[in-house]
Curated annotation (Swiss-Prot):
Pathway: Protein biosynthesis; polypeptide chain elongation. This is Elongation factor P 2. NCBIfam families: efp (TIGR00038), PRK00529.1 (NF001810). The keyword Protein biosynthesis applies. Keywords: Cytoplasm, Elongation factor, Protein biosynthesis. Belongs to the elongation factor P family.
Length: 189
């Protein structure tokens, strides 16, 4: 593990701080008129999923964490955990429901995701930036609705509820952003 200056922060970088592993969600370099510069950051704990804000002096150094990612295929949920299979060795790995959390709303059977580990400890999964999900339920279109410019709720095949444009119908396949759960577009299928 190496030490880096907080001035080298990048979104997605994993650091070890306060006896926990954190992924940098966002950061901002601040140079006030008086006083020394500092870095304001928003960090997500890889163990608990909690997001916290930290402020570092610009001269501070933090330790980077050596995490590994392995491509694995999602198989099924057995009620208490999600089961993934290593596509090269066919070994199976069960990750508890609590550790997957809201990311379960984007998981489809046979989907390939990256499983994140640190020193043999499984920390969770990393989803692709977008996933294609089928609309399971939504209100029917009513002519003239487009003038209001809003949207309507749609329940996806995984149970995720997304606000979508009025022209979306049941059975449509949509591309959904996994970082914030928003509608991106209709999928090209």
């Amino acid at each position: 593990m190496t030490m880096i200056s907080v001035n080298e922060f990048k979104n997605g970088l994993t650091i070890q701080y306060n006896n926990d592993l954190w992924r940098i969600v966002e950061f901002q370099h601040v140079k006030p008129g008086k006083g020394s510069a500092f870095v304001r950051s928003k960090l997500k704990s890889l163990r608990t999923g909690a997001v916290q804000e930290y402020t570092f002096r610009s001269t501070a150094k933090v330790e980077t964490a050596d995490i590994q990612t392995k491509s694995m295929q999602y198989l099924y949920n057995d009620g208490s955990s999600y089961v993934f299979m290593d596509t090269s060795t066919y070994d199976q790995l069960a990750i508890p429901n609590e550790q997957i959390g809201d990311e379960a709303n984007y998981l489809l059977e046979n989907m390939v995701v990256s499983v994140i580990t640190h020193e043999g400890e499984t920390l969770g999964i990393q989803l692709p930036n977008t996933v294609d999900l089928k609309v399971a339920k939504t209100e029917p279109n009513i002519k003239g609705d487009t003038s209001s410019g809003g949207g309507k709720p749609a329940t996806m095949e995984t149970g995720l509820v997304v606000n979508v444009p009025f022209f979306i119908n049941e059975g449509d396949v949509l591309t959904i952003n996994t970082s914030d759960g928003t509608y991106v577009s209709r999928a090209n299928k």
